[in-house]
């Protein structure tokens, strides 16, 4: 059961990382696909160049939150709901705590680089 929880949280971290805030902010608020303008990159720098700072700031903040959430929040969830009987308890400062942070953070980065919602590109 404990490995299943870790796998589910890692998949959730990947899915959170796959959310392209630049793409969605551009579509929702400006009606454009940011990947068709500027450097054709769905990133906050391209949003800044094409749409300006009023759109780039929320895109950047959303990108920071989507990397922070899996690394810190998921480890706090593990500590809150998992018991030492499950073998996944990660006390702050322990080796497991940092390994889970690295795992979930790396999955969010992989999701950011290869987003499933944008066809892995």
Set out the residue ranges of the language-model regions.
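Cytosolic, membrane-interface loops and tails of multi-pass inner-membrane proteins
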Residues: 23-56
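Alpha-helical transmembrane segments
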Residues: 2-26, 54-121
């Amino acid at each position: 059961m404990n490995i299943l929880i870790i796998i589910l949280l890692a998949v959730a971290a990947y899915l959170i990382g796959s959310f392209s805030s630049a793409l969605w902010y551009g579509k929702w608020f400006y009606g454009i696909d940011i990947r068709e303008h500027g450097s054709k990159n769905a990133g906050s720098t391209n949003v800044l160049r094409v749409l300006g700072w009023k759109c780039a700031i929320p895109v950047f903040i959303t990108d920071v939150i989507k990397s922070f959430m899996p690394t810190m929040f998921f480890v706090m969830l593990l500590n809150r709901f998992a018991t030492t009987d499950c073998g996944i308890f990660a006390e702050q400062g322990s080796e497991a705590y940092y390994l889970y942070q690295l795992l979930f953070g790396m999955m969010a980065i992989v999701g950011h680089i290869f987003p499933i919602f944008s066809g892995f590109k």
